[in-house]
């Protein structure tokens, strides 16, 4: 069995200071984050026809990627590479506009790493591991002590510094963040088994019959797609995998199953590093389907949602367009501009219309006598007079005609729009015959 690579911070590991903020800041300053943001997001249907999944808007103001980027910055990790591939234009534009505040004079940066056939002129990124492998030349330039590899398409708040401290404390070669999920959902994840010290002893990617957690027959321990590696160890494993015939070039399918029986791989419980979930189960959402996306957005309309985006101690950073405040006009008995249990972004005008339990992103106009309920309306949408929207997701730039009713009759909606298994209606400008997908 190969020897485990030595931990460069072993002297620190003997100290009780391993969890204090000074120790963690030392670790985070010398950590490089690679965010994998090239996913197609095909289960989001037409919502990702012109954008990648990490670029999809969320919670009235943000993009999905903003949560991972904010976790990095708030954790003190400010050397960040974002690997992009599919339909990357809107994501790149968003990062350039909203994430230019890091200061290169202090070696802080966000570097875009588009797929560019770096290794082979006939191949783009072939898998999650290959996306990192093709950028080894870039990582070697900085020689970090640790590398954080993280997916950019989930919604959660996490202090990666705590996970780093856990990694160093256990002299790990690799650490995998994990969360317990219902057994019937575990087929969509990498599932692991651990011993009493949380050392990973088994790992299988997306199993048809996932193993349950001992003593919890209805739960499984799932990988969150968040990994910490000792840098030298990661380089060695990526180079080995690149030479392995038949590899999928994927962390979950190839890298982790290979190293688990040979090296020190530990699980890190998300509950130990999640932020702002004191009164709830740790909040983590994969919004990979229309139903999951709609449900996660609807949770934000609750009086006290599980995800706190108002926390000034752990802000979610994003691009802030220069637009005026939201406006509500008319106060007649049958024509009153109101919004209840809703998130209304800047630039919106609610003109004698009713909005309930909904999220309106920036610059949405809702005209008189229109009704919007239980819906997610993305930016720059115009909703005509007397229109009715219920349980909808409306993509950017849609113009809902006067009197149109959506979300009331599923059979009628299916003739023009996409209706999800749980009855959520997705509407895009193309479905309405309104053409181009500019500025998604």
Swiss-Prot record:
Mind listing the UniProt keywords for this protein, alphabetically? ATP-binding, Carbohydrate metabolism, Glycogen biosynthesis, Glycogen metabolism, Nucleotide-binding, Nucleotidyltransferase, Transferase
> Is the keyword Nucleotide-binding in the record?
yes
**Which pathway is this protein assigned to?**
Glycan biosynthesis; glycogen biosynthesis
Tell me the Pfam families matching this sequence: Hexapep_GlmU, NTP_transferase
Which amino acid positions bind alpha-D-glucose 1-phosphate, per UniProt? Answer: 125, 190, 205-206, 223
SUPFAM superfamilies to which the protein is assigned, alphabetical: Nucleotide-diphospho-sugar transferases (SSF53448), Trimeric LpxA-like enzymes (SSF51161)
MF-aspect GO terms? ATP binding; glucose-1-phosphate adenylyltransferase activity
Q: Which GO terms describe its biological process?
A: glycogen biosynthetic process
Q: Might you give the EC number(s) for this enzyme?
A: 2.7.7.27
Q: What is its EC class?
A: transferase
Would I find Iron among this entry's keywords?
no
> Which reaction equation describes what this protein catalyses?
alpha-D-glucose 1-phosphate + ATP + H(+) = ADP-alpha-D-glucose + diphosphate
Q: What does this protein do?
A: Involved in the biosynthesis of ADP-glucose, a building block required for the elongation reactions to produce glycogen. Catalyzes the reaction between ATP and alpha-D-glucose 1-phosphate (G1P) to produce pyrophosphate and ADP-Glc.
Under the subunit heading, UniProt states: Homotetramer.
Family affiliation: Belongs to the bacterial/plant glucose-1-phosphate adenylyltransferase family.
Q: What is this protein called?
A: Glucose-1-phosphate adenylyltransferase
User: What is the gene name?
Assistant: glgC
């Amino acid at each position: 069995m190969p020897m485990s690579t030595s931990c460069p911070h072993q002297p620190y590991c003997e100290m009780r200071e391993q969890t204090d903020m000074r120790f963690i800041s030392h670790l985070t300053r010398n950590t490089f984050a690679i965010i994998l943001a090239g996913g197609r997001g095909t289960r989001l249907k037409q919502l990702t026809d012109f954008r990648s999944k990490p670029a999809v808007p969320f919670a009235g103001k943000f993009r999905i990627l903003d949560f991972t980027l904010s976790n990095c910055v708030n954790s003190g990790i400010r050397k960040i590479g974002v690997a992009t591939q599919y339909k990357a234009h809107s994501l790149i534009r968003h990062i350039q506009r909203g994430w230019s505040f890091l200061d290169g004079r202090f070696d802080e940066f966000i570097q875009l790493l588009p797929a560019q056939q770096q290794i082979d002129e006939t191949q783009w990124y072939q898998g999650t591991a290959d996306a990192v492998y093709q950028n080894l030349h870039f990582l070697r330039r900085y020689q970090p002590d640790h590398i954080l590899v993280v997916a950019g398409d989930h919604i959660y708040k996490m202090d990666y510094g705590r996970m780093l401290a856990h990694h160093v404390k256990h002299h790990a070669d690799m650490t995998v963040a994990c969360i317990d999920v219902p057994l019937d959902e575990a087929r969509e994840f990498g599932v692991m088994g651990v011993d009493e010290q949380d050392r990973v002893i088994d790992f299988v990617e997306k199993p048809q019959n996932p193993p349950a957690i001992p003593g919890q027959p209805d739960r499984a321990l799932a990988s969150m797609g968040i990994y910490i590696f000792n840098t030298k160890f990661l380089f060695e494993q990526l180079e080995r995998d690149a030479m392995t015939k038949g590899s999928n070039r994927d962390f979950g399918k190839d890298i982790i199953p290979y190293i688990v029986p040979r090296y020190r791989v530990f699980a890190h419980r998300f509950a130990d590093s999640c932020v702002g979930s004191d009164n709830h189960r740790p909040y983590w959402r994969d919004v990979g389907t229309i139903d999951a996306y709609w449900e996660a957005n609807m949770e934000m309309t609750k009086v006290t949602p599980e995800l706190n985006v108002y926390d000034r101690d752990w802000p979610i950073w994003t691009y802030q367009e220069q637009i005026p405040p939201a406006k509500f006009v008319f106060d007649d008995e049958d024509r009153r501009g109101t919004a209840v249990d809703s998130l209304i972004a800047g630039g919106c005008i609610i003109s004698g219309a009713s909005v309930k339990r909904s999220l309106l992103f920036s610059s949405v106009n809702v005209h008189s006598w229109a009704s919007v309920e239980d819906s997610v309306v993305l930016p720059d949408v115009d909703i005509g007079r007397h229109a009715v929207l219920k349980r909808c997701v409306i993509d950017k730039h849609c113009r809902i005609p006067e009197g149109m009713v959506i979300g009331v009759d599923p059979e009628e909606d299916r003739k023009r729009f996409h209706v999800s298994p749980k009855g959520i209606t997705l509407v895009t400008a193309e479905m309405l015959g309104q053409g181009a997908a500019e500025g998604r």
